[in-house]
Amino acid sequence: MSVQTRPDLKTVLISTGLVLTLAMGVRHGFGFWMQPISQAHGWTRETYSMAMALQNLMWGLFGPFAGMAVDRFGTARIVVFGALMYAAGLVWMAIVDNAALFVTGSGILIGLALSCTAFGAVSSIIGRTAPMEKRSWAFGISSAASSLGQFVMMPVEQRLISHTSWQTAFYVLAALQLLIMLPMALRLREPAAEHAHGEHQSIGNAIREAFSHKPFLCLMTGYFVCGFQVIFIGVHMPAYLKDKGILDPDVAVTALALIGLFNIFGSFYAGKLGGTIQKRYLLCTIYFSRAIVVGLFLLAPLSTWSVYLFAAGMGLLWLSTVPLTNGIIASIFGVKHLSMLSGFVFFSHQVGSFLGAWLGGYLYTRFGNYNAVWGIILLLSLFATLVNLPVSEKPVQRLQTA
């Protein structure tokens, strides 16, 4: 692992930002393949939903281990490995026509790839490179980069599917993973390990400390809700709109792109405000606002413009939880094991994602609509608002007495 005292923050943010832009941008567009793949192979929506659900679950399951690997071997090596797995997973999705192999193979490969290229993998180098007073802002920048990917890549993915074929679209995206991610990974240089401020701690002690700390468990619970909500909307929104009579695919593309566009601002300002306002209050505001936005969307007459307004509102709240959650973890436990601890919290997020993706398909297959899932989303928003209220950013005793 190449180490220097303090790498340039701008270089780190640009490099990790491009990695996140591509990793998250491609992943957010997987919903566009639901109907063409299901029709081509004669599958139900539940089959493709299970593949997406397993991807998210594996992403979360591998997350803590990817975090440990980052802390041990450095961000660059792990991102390179993740880029290779991402390309392999996309090719797998293009060539496999057996349902069981498609679900398990794509779930494991893409899930592993995302654990090595998304927030958990890059949070450590960002947290250790940015000065403490800029840390929340830096996390906001990285979260905004992932939203930029959603805004940029989703129209690209839809047009690749429309103007070539869904298989060719996978091949093109696999090539992009290698052409863009690999050079960016090689630009990442680790800051020297900082052992001041009570940061001498083994992995086992760090895990025990975190799981015995109530705010950490509250963050995990709230993040479960976040995962359930965003994945259900990202995976099932295109199909939901078609079911409701909005047949133009460009409406779904535009809506999901608007979510990405508005979350650039939402994530950036969430990170910026997190430096001056208690992050738990911002998290509570985000979750409660989601209930309001979803409720208004369901009550209003459905039209193209109501879809766009919903997308803009959800976009402001979409990944705004990420810089705040990572910032709280860094404030409480320090940055030595930040990638690993963020990975554990993110695992909870991905359990929610698994249920959001799979349950959407399961309940649709059983009842022919998504009404029950929208109701669950409303209730979970209120639950997450209450769960985040007691979360304190006060450092653990180990850091206070150092």
Which role does the model predict for each range below?
Residues 61-100:
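Conserved MFS/SLC helix-loop-helix module at the cytosolic interface between two early adjacent transmembrane helices
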